[in-house]
A protein has these predicted regions:
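Bacterial N-terminal signal peptides that target proteins for export
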Residues: 1-12
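Short linear Ser/Thr-Pro motifs
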Residues: 6, 123-124, 248, 355, ...
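N-terminal start and proteolytic maturation junction detector
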Residues: 11-14, 360
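C-terminal segment of classical bacterial N-terminal signal peptides
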Residues: 15-24
Length: 630
């Protein structure tokens, strides 16, 4: 995390509670020029998925070259494999449009199905790779693009790479394989012995190994062919047959797969003992997953997602993904998640594998979780004058990163430079909006936002209630005005809700913003702490933001009534240690502006003397970044 982040969001929003004194209907396309030139693309696209078993009706994959013109148009030339055409690769070409915002958020018209859109992000230069997924339609997919230059030679591939893969053999969800291996290339067409670790759904989903010797690679026409031995029965081995691979211009990334198959392979240049501290800042992510829930009855659970994570340089990260489950609409998930500890990391379900430079990582599922996630480091930004960091419009409670949408009534923190001439906090309610605070105003889709705190590097504000889907707005554009000087504009997605639980800094400040114990009170208004834990059967008060519209409505920045309670319009669920809690109240905290409160009963049977996840779920959001002392 960049050093300008500070733990003031909770103190300025909850001051006193704990004794602490125009429509934006089009995505920002201002950075289209950042996506320009020749890219190698691998995409696996699954459609016609059965809503009960997740059986795949049609599988398609493409591999080849996509050329972006820097002005919002692309062409693709390569090969497509389609189960509707016998699963034999055929020449394929397509064209379409794309947009890239100032923060790297991208939307690309699908080259496989022009009615679908790939959502994702463009990474930092060196290389500016793209990761994306079509989460808003009925299909599930993963899209990876890396910049490629002149024709690759055998000498271009030298050194050690992690490679991760996911393979829907014959386009069948019940025959999915995944795994990872290390490649050591000599620059002359030879690999050292390879050990593949992975699992096969059709072989019992038990983690297994495959040893390969004498594997070679050859370069021709810009493509590197990895000559894995072809097994007589490919369904019984993790890896089989030749793979067509591309290498990025900086030689650090690989992407490809089988032209006649439905696999995706991503490789990252690596080394032993990669420092955890290298993993800082924002990473754009995309993934495709199939969880085997009952193979004997044909049940699979396929989902795809795009998102981002904010790596804290301490081995942990705040993670958001826009996840499209089979049989349901996409929703937004935020969690805190451990990433790396000096190299690869296994959390019991996923194996995470880092690149040597911190520019990328891959994550592979194990056993019955068949998954491939790719993370690409986003660009770091700086500016002069009044400047919003394009990656730093964050939920003020969870610090969920830039792909997380904003919701009406949500407390948001904006980070940057020159945002204010001095530090100021609102002293009364309603919070100032058009009148400004310390000479500062903030516009959200042209509306003045109520301000609770301003400083040269951070502003805390309330998103006006008319913002988002309730106002037929898919995007929200933020702009700061400091003493009549306007900042750059930054555009993000919106949703009905974007829950974020406020957390407390404790243990001498060891918890970074967005991670730690939840801000929860007992009935006597004392804090829930390790020495004063929650108990089964008691009613607790949880404080959060991003729960959206309320009834009766409250004016922007005004205090919620202390006599007529404003309850949230969305259905809310609270999960404590895996058990659903009964909710007595969910709405605005009486007497406060923009602060939401949930009163819930701690379920019986929770583990004592520990910490458990406290999860808040809405119809379109899922927040699991905070924990509860029990």
């Amino acid at each position: 995390m960049n050093s300008h982040y500070s733990e003031v969001a909770l103190s300025t929003v909850l001051c006193g509670m704990f004794g602490i004194s125009a429509l934006a209907q089009n995505i920002d396309a201002s950075a289209n020029s950042s996506l320009s030139g020749t890219y190698a693309v691998r995409q696996v696209f699954l459609s016609g998925i059965d809503q009960n078993t997740s059986a795949i009706g049609r599988a398609r994959s493409i591999i080849g070259i996509m050329t972006f013109d820097g002005n919002g148009k692309y062409t693709f030339n390569g090969q497509m494999c389609d189960t509707n055409s016998g699963s034999t690769a055929q020449a394929y070409s397509a064209s379409g449009s794309y947009s890239v915002g100032a923060n790297g958020l991208a939307e690309i018209q699908s080259a496989i199905d022009s009615t679908d859109t790939e959502y994702g992000g463009v990474g930092a230069t060196g290389p500016s790779a793209v990761v994306a997924s079509a989460t808003e339609g009925s299909s599930k997919d993963i899209f990876i693009a890396i910049p490629v230059g002149s024709s690759a030679t055998n000498g271009a591939l030298s050194g050690t790479y992690w490679a991760g893969f996911e393979d829907f053999l014959e386009g069948n969800a019940s025959q999915v394989h995944d795994g990872y291996y290390m490649l050591t290339a000599d620059g002359k067409g030879n690999f050292a012995d390879i050990t593949v670790a992975g699992a096969m759904a059709n072989q019992g989903s038990t983690n297994g190994m495959q040893s390969l010797s004498g594997v070679t690679y050859t370069a021709s026409g810009g493509v590197l062919t990895f000559n894995f031995p072809a097994a007589s029965t490919p369904l019984t081995v993790l890896v089989s047959g030749p793979k067509s691979m591309y290498i990025s211009t900086d030689r650090n990334l690989l992407v490809g797969g089988s032209p006649n198959g439905f696999d995706v392979i991503v490789g990252l240049k690596t080394a032993s003992g990669v420092p955890t501290a290298q993993y800082q800042g924002t990473y754009f992510t995309a993934g495709l997953e199939n969880v085997i829930t009952g193979l004997s009855s044909g049940n699979n659970s396929i989902d795809s997602f795009y998102g981002s994570n904010l790596a804290l340089g301490q081995g942990s990260t705040i993670y958001h993904e826009r996840q499209a489950y089979f049989g349901s609409a996409a929703d937004d998930i935020t969690v805190n998640w451990y990433l790396f500890n000096g190299g690869q990391y296994f959390d019991g379900i996923y194996e995470a594998l880092p690149s040597v430079s911190g520019q990328a990582y891959i994550q592979v599922g194990t056993q019955t979780t068949y998954s491939l996630t790719v993370g690409i480091q986003a660009k770091q930004y700086s500016g002069t004058g009044v400047f919003i960091d394009p990656l730093s419009i964050l939920n003020a409670a969870s610090y969920a990163p830039i792909t997380n949408p904003v919701a009406p009534g949500e407390f948001v923190s904006i980070f940057g430079s020159g945002l204010a001439s001095s530090t100021a906090s609102a002293q009364s309610l309603p919070l100032p909006a058009k009148a400004g605070l310390g000479g500062v105003q903030v516009l959200v889709n042209g509306r003045y936002a109520p301000l609770s705190y301003v400083s040269p590097t951070q502003i805390n504000l309330l998103v006006p209630y008319a913002t988002g889907p309730v106002g037929n707005e898919s995007y929200a554009t933020f702009q700061v005005i400091n003493n009549n000087e306007a900042s750059n504009k930054v555009t993000v997605h919106t949703n009905y809700t974007a829950p974020g639980v406020f957390s407390l800094t404790s243990n001498g400040g060891t918890y970074p913003p967005g991670i730690g114990p939840a801000a929860v009170l007992h009935a006597d208004y004392s804090l829930v702490t390790q020495s004063n834990p929650a108990k089964a059967g008691e009613t607790l008060q949880l404080y959060l933001t991003g729960l959206g519209s309320v009834t009766p409505s409250v004016a922007d920045g005004a205090a919620a009534s202390t006599t007529t309670l404003s309850t949230v319009d969305e259905h809310i669920y609270v999960i404590v240690g895996g058990a659903q809690a009964n909710i007595a109240f969910a709405g605005l905290a009486p007497g406060f502006a923009g602060l939401y409160q949930i009163n819930f009963v701690v379920p019986g049977g929770i583990t004592t003397g520990s910490t458990v996840y406290l999860i808040v779920i809405t119809q379109d959001g899922y927040s699991a970044e905070a924990k509860l002392y029990t």
